[in-house]
Amino acid sequence: GLIFAPAANALPQRDLGPANPTTIGERCSNPGDTGQTVDIKRTYFDGSAGSWTVSNYNDEPLPVTRSITETKTKTWNVSAGIDFKLMDLINFTFSSSYTDSQSYEVGEQVGPYNIAPGKTAVLRAGWVVSDFEGQKTVCGSDHKWQANGGTFTATLPKERHIEVSTRDNNDWG
């Protein structure tokens, strides 16, 4: 019978470290290597740090500043069973501004924001947050990254954000 020996240029399987960003279907060099792929499913504003409503019944703009009266923190939320450095994967793939925790501290100032005459403004303090979904990957015998089961999800804050919306004042007359 025939005897098959491994090709001289075959590489041993290697551990690429805890976070190895990959794209399913793209070429990989070493079958058996593992990694992860991750996508942002949605990004939204979470305004749970505080809100203030201020009306300007004057004839000129009204500068408004508010103080944070209670510390509010947004922490990350990840699915169970993640056995690699998820934060590294997200920072490599998208942005280093994603963190595991961001806070507003007591005494911090929000503003100033100018409220136009005859307008009511609602200021909401919070965070820009993204929901992520990902999957573990493996380099297949065809030298392409493929899904390897092990899906995961995460929600992480990207940045603190103040949302300001205005409307016409109510006419109480």
Task: Report residues per predicted region.
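Secretory targeting and sorting signals
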Residues: 1-12
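Core pore-forming/fusogenic effector modules of secreted, proteolytically activated toxins
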Residues: 11-69, 103-173
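Membrane-insertion modules used to breach or fuse lipid bilayers
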Residues: 62-114
